[in-house]
């Protein structure tokens, strides 16, 4: 109860702060992009610093190609933080373990087991392992790890979850227990986390990285149970929304993915599950999105659906000024539509509240 009240107080304070910020500044906090380069003087890193300084982006995401060495990573992250005139940027990565690790033993970062292997070791081992992982990531200058995966391992032939051992199990209570250990370990290090892949990718037959994924006939409401548990316990910093399609939650629109669906985000996640934290899209350059929507349509639909942070890996066709372009789309639409501007203000308040909790904003 006290944790919930504290979070509510932070959100109210952040909402008040939103009124003191310009539309440009608020919109910028919603943009997270990837980059090219693995050194602090590389052009892609310099471009990020400029966009952070101009308050056009609020965070960055690392891929493995951005990691040359741990000292280089620390130098880049320090430079990105120093560029910020206001709240510090989210510096994010996927370090789940197993197949999904951006920092690897090849650069001197000890490997983390997959979720499947962690579950085999038991909850006590998981608690110690994730506490260590959180500390080691924070020491490199990261402040958000995109995990835990709370998908249920329902389809043994699933090409994106089961195939790589990314789920803790089939049972929602088991998954929620290991996810809570992941979150606690990162929180102890001052890091944020993101539950993924809402509303559940474990039953799918395809991989949304590659293209359209329809889960209408295979998805189960039980896939929401880990979210329900972790949200009720106040452990959900962010929820990452997947690009999967369910005909019953698409407002009658063919092939509208969850990441662009108000029924999933505003209806189920915020309404039914009561989540009032930060909603972040999965990578908006995955095939399921890129093949169907223009950049402008993607950005506008994502905000109207209820996403607070728009994540672009910037890998489909690298553009060093992508963050600036997304920011310009947001600002132009907000200037033309007061309702859209109100959405930006709401998202800014949630983002700022999380950054305050993580020590990234005063």
What are these regions (language model features)?
Residues 32-43, 115-126, 209-221, 285-293:
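Active-site mouth loops of central-metabolism enzymes
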Residues 40-52, 126-133, 221-227, 294-299:
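Short, acidic/polar
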Residues 329, 335-362:
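Mid-to-C-terminal alpha-helical segments outside catalytic/metal-binding sites
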Residues 19-105, 311-312, 353:
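N-terminal hydrophobic targeting/anchoring segments and the immediately downstream early-domain regions
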Residues 69-73, 120-132, 173-177:
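Glycine-rich anion/phosphate-binding loops
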Residues 1-20:
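Gram-negative bacterial Sec-dependent N-terminal signal peptides
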Residues 84-110, 130-153, 175-199:
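Glycine-rich, aromatic-flanked loop segments that form ligand/cofactor-binding clefts
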Residues 60, 68-83, 174-335, 339:
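Second-shell residues forming the walls of enzyme active-site clefts
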């Amino acid at each position: 109860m006290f944790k919930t009240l504290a979070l509510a107080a932070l959100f109210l304070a952040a909402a008040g702060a939103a009124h003191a910020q310009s539309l440009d500044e608020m919109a910028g906090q919603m943009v997270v992009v990837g980059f090219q380069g693995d050194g602090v003087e590389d052009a892609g890193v310099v471009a990020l610093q400029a966009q952070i300084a101009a308050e056009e982006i609020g965070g960055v995401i690392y891929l493995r190609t951005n990691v040359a060495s741990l000292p280089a990573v620390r130098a880049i992250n320090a430079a990105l933080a120093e560029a910020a005139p206001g709240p510090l940027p989210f510096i994010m990565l996927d370090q789940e373990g197993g197949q999904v690790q951006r920092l690897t033993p090849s650069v001197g970062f000890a490997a983390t087991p997959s979720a499947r292997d962690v579950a085999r070791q038991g909850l006590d081992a998981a608690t110690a392992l994730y506490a260590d992982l959180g500390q080691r990531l924070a020491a490199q200058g990261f402040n958000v790890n995109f995990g835990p995966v709370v998908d249920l391992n329902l389809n043994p032939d699933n090409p994106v979850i089961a195939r790589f051992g990314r789920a803790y199990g089939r049972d929602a209570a088991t998954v929620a227990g290991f996810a809570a250990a992941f979150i606690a370990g990162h929180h102890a290090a001052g890091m944020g986390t993101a539950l993924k892949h809402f509303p559940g990718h474990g039953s799918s037959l395809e991989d949304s990285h590659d293209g359209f994924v329809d889960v209408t006939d295979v998805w189960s409401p039980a896939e929401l149970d880990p979210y329900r548990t972790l949200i009720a316990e106040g452990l959900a910093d962010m929820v990452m929304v997947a690009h999967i399609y369910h005909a019953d939650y698409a407002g009658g629109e063919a092939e509208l993915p969850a990441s662009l669906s108000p029924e999933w985000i505003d209806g189920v996640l915020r309404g039914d599950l009561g989540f009032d934290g930060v909603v972040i899209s999965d990578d908006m350059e995955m095939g399921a999105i890129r093949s169907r929507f223009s950049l402008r349509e993607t950005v506008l639909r994502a905000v109207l659906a209820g996403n607070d942070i728009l994540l672009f890996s910037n890998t489909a066709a690298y553009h060093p000024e992508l963050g600036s372009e997304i920011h310009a789309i947001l600002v132009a639409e907000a200037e033309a539509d007061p309702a859209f501007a109100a959405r930006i203000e709401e998202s800014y308040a949630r983002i700022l509240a999380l950054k305050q909790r993580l020590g990234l904003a005063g």
